[in-house]
Amino acid sequence: MIRPLHLSMAVALLCALAYLLGGRPASAQHQHTVLTGQAAFTDAAHESPGIRRHLTVADLPAPAPQESVDNGPKIVPRPAGMLPIAPKGFKVELYATGLDNPRLIRTAPNGDLFLAESETGKIKVFRGVSPDGKAAQVFVFADGLHQPFGIAFYPAGPNPAWVYIGNTDGIVRFPYKNGDLVATGPAEHLADLPGGGRLRGGGHWTRDLVFSKDGTKLLASVGSHSNVDDSDSHPEEFHRADVLEFTPEGKFIKVYASGLRNCVGEAINPITGELWCSTNERDGLGNNYPPDYITHVQEDGFYGWPWFLYGGPSGGIQDPRHPGKHPELQSKVITPDILVNPHFASLEMLFYEGRQFPAKFKGDGFAAEHGSWNRAQRGGYEVIRLPMKNGRATGEYEDFLTGFTLPDDTVWGRPVGVAEARDGSLFVSDDGSRSIWHVSYVGSR
């Protein structure tokens, strides 16, 4: 007997069909081309797995402050049966749901998945996979933390002794050995960081942590206190919009790199050993200006904030809100490696080292795009792939995991974190649907 579809399932199927056939181009149309120039600018309705884009500074419009809008997403429940959309050959499963503000995720050497539930001040641990695809076990590793975000295991290798946590106001660590599901000792405070706060267009509170490849440097990213306040006259911007270098014991060494407005996600390129940042650029200059970016970070490098934007013939372009400021720095502004569409809010990133995905993915990057609010046409809300050649960016990026928005311009999912599972599959945290997704390759090779 054929049973009638449940109404919610029918609505979900119709919604998904409309989404696929309505506002979204077929990815096959662009799988073998790279969109450049004005064609590379996009919105969520035209994001689809397999589409590649290559934005350059020559493609960028002039600043247009009059275009700026406050267009935050309307978050709605995930329609029943709806999943993120991955490239052909990939399978997406729901790994965990009902979470409270799931943010950054990192995989421990033994394969356990650590999650920062920033709003509740908790670090959770997920272990294994049940027959239904969900996590087999979930534990609270630690709580009572201050908006935790960054997670790093030290030393590198199969037997770490510590797990470091980036609170919004400092760095702490817990004793840790492989397999620990609950902290076996209290948090040890190592260093203070400038305190955070949640403000639209500023007050960036996330603090990511990574160790250099040789293990001698602890690098902490600290976003700006404001959208674009002049740090000369705003002391609250001290040691913000920077990557700060510490020893593993928490001794401050120096500002490792500056002018990075909000480096939310850090990663070490395993081939080159270089630090990379996934960075949110400033707001208020127009729908398509300036692009967010993902880049390798030069030690002692300057990336422009707040006085300059990247991409000028002499280095930087003066931010129109800071005319004439610091001309001596203009030539020092570094142009990033990968320009992502403007206001996409690029968050956690990683470099893929596994073998579960096809070989062409080895060494490429992935980054979570949380989605725009300062743009008339909503964009982002996806995970992107960052093609690499011998550890160097090609400048392109590719839509990888999409489908988090609906045809009526509402949003059901917002990717935040990406982590590689021990078997080489991918986890994606999503604070829109309060979930973690599991992406694996099941196609032919």
Name these PLM-found stretches.
Residues 83, 110-135, 179:
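Beta-propeller domains
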Residues 33-87, 160, 172, 206, ...:
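Beta-propeller domain segments
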Residues 102-103, 122-156:
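Blade-loop segments of beta-propeller domains
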Residues 94-99, 140-146, 190-201, 255-259, ...:
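Surface loop/turn motifs at the tips and blade-to-blade linkers of beta-strand repeat domains
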Residues 120, 135, 168, 184, ...:
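A detector of repeated loop/turn-to-beta-strand junctions in beta-rich toroidal repeat architectures
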Residues 137-138, 144-148, 152-154, 161, ...:
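Asp-box/WD-like beta-propeller blade repeats and closely related beta-sheet repeat scaffolds
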Residues 113-115, 161-165, 217-220, 275-277, ...:
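Hydrophobic beta-strand segments that make up the repeating blades of beta-propeller
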